[in-house]
Every structure is written in structure tokens, then in C-alpha cells.
Amino acid sequence: MAKEMSDHQDSEHFTYDRSWGEIEQMLFEAELQMNKHNTEALAAVHKDNRIFHVRNYTALRGVVKTLRWVLGDIKVKDPLK
């Protein structure tokens, strides 16, 4: 009996029409936001504000790593590690 594919494996939900330029632009914007959150976290006086910026910085690190992997960055062997 065949297993049903999850939505990320079902190709009808994906267009696969992103250009390399779009991916590079997204990487550029993600790096800008990541750096902004890092700067804000370092400057934050209140703990809640610092936590907010660190959380967003950490999430964007994952985004940046994944986009670099998609673009073939030789320094990123596996974006999940």
C-alpha cells in the first residue's frame, strides 16, 4: 500500500518558479534583518526586548543558512545542522 505524500512532497503545491535572483535578493534581505536584530539585541536594555531580538536573530540565522545552502554555498553542507 502506497504512503500518502505530505504537502511538502506533493509537487502540485509548489510552482518551482523562483529565479536565482529572487533567492539571492531574499538572502540579502534576510541578512539585513538578521544583522538589525543582532544589533538591537546587543543594545537592548530590557530583558523582554533583548529576548525578542535574539529570537528573531536566531530564526533568521536558519533562514540565511538554508538560502545559502540552496544557492550552493560550499561552507553550508547541511542547513539542518
Regions found by a protein language model. Give the residues of each.
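Short, charge/polar-rich alpha-helical segments
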Residues: 4-32
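Short intrinsically disordered terminal tails
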Residues: 1-13, 72-81
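Short, charge-rich amphipathic interface segments used for partner binding and complex assembly
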Residues: 33-80
